[in-house]
């Protein structure tokens, strides 16, 4: 059976307001999936249903083709967006306790806790109370709590929130270690540039419905704009008068522009070559931010 976590046609309403509408996507083993959407789009509700914190009105969540039960969910790692830590409890003591709740012996939980705190740069503060930590360091503790039992699946709600650039790099390294070990990782984030850099697959949700999902390459190809970039030896200002060209940006010899459907990019390239050397010319790959705006507006 393929190691895939599948969300299939999940819907959920609160009172008369439907917040999820037939949400469907896969999280594949060994791949990192970014879950992006505006505030209130349905990301957290979806994750809570995946972990059994909330029940779906309809639809299913399966792992390796089987419905999730309590025993299966104990093998998942989950980091909620809200702080779920005991403020007056020691860092290591807290993670050890949570590891035991997932079935680890105290010795195993202690060993794994100290290894994780070392990896996350918190080993020297293992006995401090959580309330003494910065928000960013509390975030690291929450990640350690999600990882301590070596989960089969990892679901993280805004794991990069409040982290400085160095802490982000550490977190990225930890998540990549998990995917390299074959773990499917799903995380939500508002940092689209980070998601684009880090993730293999993307899921975009808006108003409780999935607007786009697939691999990073597939989405870029599917939502590619008729946009090109050119760099010539001299000034590229002549593009202003070229038929079918709409300038997006122009900076001396470099320009980014859109082509109308009737325009011929090869004819334009020949025109550029007639005017002098062309250092580069080609289509511009859309960014995740551009794809996000296109599918959610």
Language-model segment annotations:
Residues 4-5, 12-206, 212:
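ABC transporter nucleotide-binding domains
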Residues 72, 223, 296:
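Short, flexible helix/strand-to-coil boundary loops that buttress conserved ligand/catalytic motifs
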